[in-house]
């Protein structure tokens, strides 16, 4: 198929989807007044009605259309012509006329003998290897509804008749329907294809001259139906009848007596053979009488053909040759397998693919709404639909599985294995060869002699052979089917088989429980979606990909249970992603937020576990060694790699950060005091906030998740250091051992939300002060671990760079390999005196006058990482390289090159979190752009401090004057800072 040809059909496909969407949502868009499906019997009709009801309930079908499913009357096989007349009677009963009515009639009442796995559900609702844009897997019915959505706008009234086993690809804009008569929609196909179908031969007026049904290549050539390219005008099964033709045709059955004469199993009229033939301009009545019927030559058929000829002969059938167009016939099982495995590549331009609604671990087989568990072996060219393969099962090459669970079995090659639940609750699994023709008497390519007489009547075909045992469970029925195969191969348990109640392909489909089939498909589809969801997570997929899986239906309670079971068995990194992505997919709901919280709870538990492995709670079992102690620490500025130190990224990937300790106004801004109290209580004070609290109940000290609690940091430090337990205990027992306790924190001259690491450094100062108070011997690593635990207990989610930056003087390059227990390597960067002087002269902090709560921002950034946002993953990796390069340039004294890296980092920071900047920050940088060489935020950004590197020769006073001129008295100002 040529590229331009494919592009045209693809665009037509996309246009059809847009027409379909308009038919659902626009009241002025022309739609079918009636969509009628024909069915072979009431059971099949009920199955069709259920399928339609499901789609209507989900608003997937045009609401203005009247839907009807009409089984052959009285359960008799009346042929497609009889079914058409039955449809006409239905519409006329409803409307009284055909004028002004647009009717779509899809003939879908066959037994599907050539593809028996679709006998029960009907080939019309058999799967197509395509996932629709709304996330649903497609069926032939869905393709008809979508593909024909544009046709009503092309016709005034009348009926479009389609064959339910042929998928047509064309552009409705090419349809030019006649006002009266009929029109046959035809595509060009190779003569080798045409010989197995109907072929039209055009007369001089552009009408159908002859209708040649399943003729040889020689016959088609001799009748002039083959063009120079070896192509024929194939009968696609799509025919338009005008309203006046329908009215005349209806006169044949407008009374009960007439209806009974034409719609019965003796006449068994064919729509294509008996209604189209008289419309061909060169046909004759004598030839018409001799045309091969769907059933048998009978007197009733002869009489009906005479009447049909008289009614239709005055009309002609225009031949509508559409191109580019394509005709896809869902014929035999062998053809179906070939189409689903190798054939899909020819239709990739239609988004057809081997794996639809499933997870394929290999490209050597195809599946549709199926699951294959680890340890199973699926050989080449298999096709699995609505099936579950587990327990190290082996599926032989070329085999087709349908509606079956196979556990631990070895299924032979080139067979079909199809299970049905029957209306009495029992099961039958039918096995036959992919190449078998059920209309014939062969089985698995050989005779059926091994089974003896397995027929009730004279039809000794596989279709009627009662060889399939009925069992109490699907698993037992699979075993029984494999025994049938073994018997055909000359082995097997004959006694078990002969003593069992058995059914045929025919009788089993007529006894099928259609509701159970639909329930099975839906149940499996839910499980498959879970597998796809988990696969997206495990394969570093994104939230958008995860949401696409559930776009057509909300996550059910059953699916949530499956996901939670998988999460329970997963490692912590997978588990947190599962919960986070599940919460995001569920949207802004209470349940969704609960799952997101569980994701961060997993991170918190992981960090606490890592800290515990390093030995947190060091103050436990210690007595105070001092009456009072005080700790003062500097702040830090982050230059490179910030965010890579944040759990869970650092635990999973490792982290690299470059930062420096600073003083503000020449002072150490962070201060913590701890002292003994005579009373049995804990007193906490946040001096800079003017808050003081007295605690005598331990549970009040264990509540650490409120970011607005002025004592949340104090409480978390007491828990992390082991002064009080995280849960349980009595405060009176603790104070009896260590006495009363006073802990006070204070930040000197630092605005809230500064971005200078105040919270984490304050946590580190609390830990350091408690260690000193209790006389705990410790290393710097102990301080870092405990401070990080404080962060996690508060649910801030912060990393380790702030503690290192504030507790250790100078410029540091800090690295940590991946691992739940973070082992920090701190390398002090030795700078020349000239470089230090230049940095202190050019490096400047600017306060924005704004603040941003880091807790919410951390959730966003961490969420983007664990949901595998591609730009976030890239930036988190790249900023670590920049941190190392910054250290390299500063060690060489290349401050200008450091400034360039600072700018590059700023762009990457915005990729990690777009909220790190805003209009005000952008305006500040714009106002001083000519004065600075480098720019960066402090901490998370979005407020607090900005850091800049002045151009050579520019003074801090010049910068301050520019800011004051631009922003007046709104709080934007240069702050005095010193690198130490």
What do the PLM-derived regions correspond to, one by one?
Residues 348-374:
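Surface beta-strand/loop "capping" patches
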Residues 726-750:
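Glycine- and acidic-rich phosphate- and metal-coordinating loops
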């Amino acid at each position: 198929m040529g590229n331009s040809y494919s592009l045209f059909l693809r665009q037509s496909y996309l246009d059809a989807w847009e027409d379909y969407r308009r038919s659902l949502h626009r009241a002025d868009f022309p739609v079918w007044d009636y969509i009628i499906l024909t069915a072979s019997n009431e059971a099949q009709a009920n199955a069709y009605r259920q399928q339609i009801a499901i789609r209507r309930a989900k608003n997937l079908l045009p609401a203005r259309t009247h839907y009807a499913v009409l089984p052959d009357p009285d359960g008799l096989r009346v042929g497609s012509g009889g079914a058409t007349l039955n449809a006409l009677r239905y519409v006329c009963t409803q409307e009284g006329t055909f004028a002004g009515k647009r009717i779509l009639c899809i003939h879908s009442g066959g037994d599907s003998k050539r593809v028996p796995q679709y006998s029960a559900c009907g080939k019309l609702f058999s799967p197509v290897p395509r996932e629709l844009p709304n996330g649903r897997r497609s069926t032939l019915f869905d393709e008809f509804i979508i593909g024909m959505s544009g046709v009503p706008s092309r016709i005034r009234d009348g009926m479009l008749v389609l064959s339910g086993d042929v998928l047509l690809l064309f552009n409705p804009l090419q349809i030019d329907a006649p006002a009266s008569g009929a029109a046959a929609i035809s595509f060009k196909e190779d003569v080798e294809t045409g010989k197995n179908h109907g072929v039209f031969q055009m007369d001089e007026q552009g009408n159908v001259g002859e209708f040649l049904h399943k003729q040889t290549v020689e016959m088609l050539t001799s009748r002039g139906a083959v063009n120079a390219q070896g192509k024929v005008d194939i009968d696609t099964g799509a025919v338009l009848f005008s309203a006046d033709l329908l009215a005349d045709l209806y006169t044949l059955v407008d009374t009960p007596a007439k209806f009974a004469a034409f719609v019965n199993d003796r006449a068994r009229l064919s729509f294509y053979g008996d209604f189209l033939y008289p419309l061909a301009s060169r046909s004759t009545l004598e030839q018409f009488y001799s045309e091969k019927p769907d059933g048998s030559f009978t007197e009733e058929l002869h009489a009906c053909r005479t009447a049909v000829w008289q009614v239709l002969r005055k009309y002609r059938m225009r031949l509508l040759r559409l191109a580019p167009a394509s005709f896809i016939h869902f014929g035999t099982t062998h053809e179906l397998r070939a189409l689903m495995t190798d054939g899909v590549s020819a239709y990739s331009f239609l988004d057809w693919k081997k794996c639809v609604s499933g997870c394929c671990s290999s490209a050597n087989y195809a599946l549709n709404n199926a699951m294959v568990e680890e340890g199973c072996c699926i050989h080449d060219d298999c096709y699995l639909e609505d099936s579950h393969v587990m327990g190290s099962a082996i599926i032989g090459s070329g085999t087709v599985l349908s509606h079956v669970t196979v556990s631990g079995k070895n299924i032979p090659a080139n067979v079909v294995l199809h299970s049905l639940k029957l209306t009495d609750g029992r099961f039958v699994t039918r096995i036959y060869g992919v190449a078998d023709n059920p209309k014939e008497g062969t089985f698995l390519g050989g005779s059926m002699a091994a089974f003896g007489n397995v027929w009730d009547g004279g039809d000794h075909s596989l279709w009627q052979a009662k060889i399939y045992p009925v069992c109490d469970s699907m698993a037992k029925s699979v075993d029984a089917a494999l025994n049938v195969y073994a018997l055909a191969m000359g082995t097997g348990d004959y006694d078990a088989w002969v003593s069992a109640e058995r059914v045929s392909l025919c009788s089993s489909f007529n006894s099928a429980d259609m509701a159970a089939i639909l329930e099975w498909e839906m149940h499996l589809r839910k499980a498959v979606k879970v597998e796809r969801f988990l696969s997206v997570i495990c394969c570093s997929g994104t939230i958008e990909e995860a949401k696409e899986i559930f776009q057509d239906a909300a996550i059910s309670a059953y699916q949530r249970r499956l996901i939670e079971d998988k999460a329970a068995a997963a490692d912590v990194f997978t588990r947190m992603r599962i919960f986070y992505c599940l919460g995001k997919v569920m949207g802004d709901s209470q349940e969704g937020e609960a799952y997101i919280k569980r994701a961060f709870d997993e991170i918190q538990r992981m960090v606490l576990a890592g800290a515990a492995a390093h030995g947190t709670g060091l103050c436990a079992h210690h007595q105070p060694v001092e009456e009072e102690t005080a700790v003062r620490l500097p702040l830090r500025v982050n230059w490179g790699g910030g965010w890579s130190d944040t759990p869970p990224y650092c635990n999973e990937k490792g982290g690299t950060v470059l930062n420096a300790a600073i003083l503000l106004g020449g002072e150490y801004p962070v201060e913590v005091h701890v002292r003994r109290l005579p009373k049995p209580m804990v007193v906490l004070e946040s001096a800079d906030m003017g808050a003081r609290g007295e605690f005598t109940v331990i549970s009040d000290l264990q509540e650490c998740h409120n970011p607005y609690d002025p004592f949340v940091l104090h409480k978390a430090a007491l828990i992390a250091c082991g002064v009080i337990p995280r849960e349980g205990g009595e405060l009176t027992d603790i104070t009896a051992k260590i006495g009363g306790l006073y802990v006070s924190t204070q930040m000197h001259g630092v605005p809230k939300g500064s971005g200078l690491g105040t919270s984490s450094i304050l946590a580190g100062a609390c830990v350091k002060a408690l260690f000193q108070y209790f006389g705990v011997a410790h290393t710097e690593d102990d301080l870092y671990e405990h401070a990080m635990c404080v962060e996690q207990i508060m649910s801030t989610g912060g990393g380790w760079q702030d503690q290192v930056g504030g507790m250790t003087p100078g410029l540091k390059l800090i690295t940590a390999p991946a691992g739940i227990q973070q082992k920090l390597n701190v390398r002090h960067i030795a700078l020349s005196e000239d470089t230090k002087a230049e940095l202190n002269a050019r490096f400047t902090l600017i306060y924005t006058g704004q603040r941003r709560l880091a807790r919410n921002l951390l959730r966003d950034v961490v969420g983007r990482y664990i949901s595998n946002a591609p730009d976030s993953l890239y930036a988190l990796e790249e900023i670590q390289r920049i941190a190392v390069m910054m250290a390299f340039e500063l060690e060489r004294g290349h401050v200008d090159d450091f400034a360039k890296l600072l700018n590059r980092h700023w762009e990457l920071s915005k990729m990690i979190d777009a909220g790190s900047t805003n209009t005000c920050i952008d305006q500040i940088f714009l106002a001083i752009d000519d004065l600075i060489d480098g720019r960066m935020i402090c901490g998370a950004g979005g407020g607090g401090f900005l850091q800049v590197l002045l151009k050579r020769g520019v003074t801090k006073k010049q910068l301050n004057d520019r800011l004051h001129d631009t922003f007046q008295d709104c709080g934007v100002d240069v702050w005095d800072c010193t690198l130490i």
